[in-house]
Amino acid sequence: MFVWKDEFELGIDKIDNEHRKLFEIANKGYELLKNEFYVDKYDKIMDIIVELKEYAEFHFSEEEDYLASIGYKKLFTHKLEHDSFIKKVESFNIKEIDYDQDKYIQEMLDFVVTWIKEHILEKDREYID
């Protein structure tokens, strides 16, 4: 399970709440990974990927609007980071899911959680300092 920690707080309620939601989506993947009652997880994996992509696009748009409103000088670079995340999610090879569903979920979660944590702790922290 992926736990929200105080160190992820930026002090901007709207952004912090949206970041928490990204953790919640990742936790759906974790719960699916640990659920031994689903023999075929393909549809659930696809649901999580779609939700992750759609919510990330929403969040990134909101965050970029906020950054524009405060005149953040590194907005373009920050947007490129967001774009790379979306491209990676879009590149998840859905044909590979069926070969080893749990392995696929784990690899997907490793990428998503690492990216989100690093992005919040490094890139997002830059605009509040």
Swiss-Prot record:
Fe cation 2 binds at residues 63, 78, 82, 119, 124. It comes from the Bacteria. GO terms for molecular function: iron ion binding; oxygen carrier activity. CDD domains: Hemerythrin (cd12107). InterPro entries: Bacteriohemerythrin-like, Haemerythrin_Fe_BS, Hemerythrin, Hemerythrin-like, Hemerythrin-like_sf, Hemerythrin_metal-bd. Gene3D superfamilies: Hemerythrin-like. The keyword Cytoplasm does not apply. Fe cation 1 binds at residues 19, 59, 63, 124. Keywords: Iron, Metal-binding, Oxygen transport, Transport. The keyword Ligase does not apply. Monomer. NCBIfam families: bact_hemeryth, hemeryth_dom. Belongs to the hemerythrin family. Oxygen-binding protein. May be involved in a storage mechanism or for delivery to oxygen-requiring enzymes. The oxygen-binding site contains two iron atoms. This is Bacteriohemerythrin. It comes from Clostridium acetobutylicum (strain ATCC 824 / DSM 792 / JCM 1419 / IAM 19013 / LMG 5710 / NBRC 13948 / NRRL B-527 / VKM B-1787 / 2291 / W).
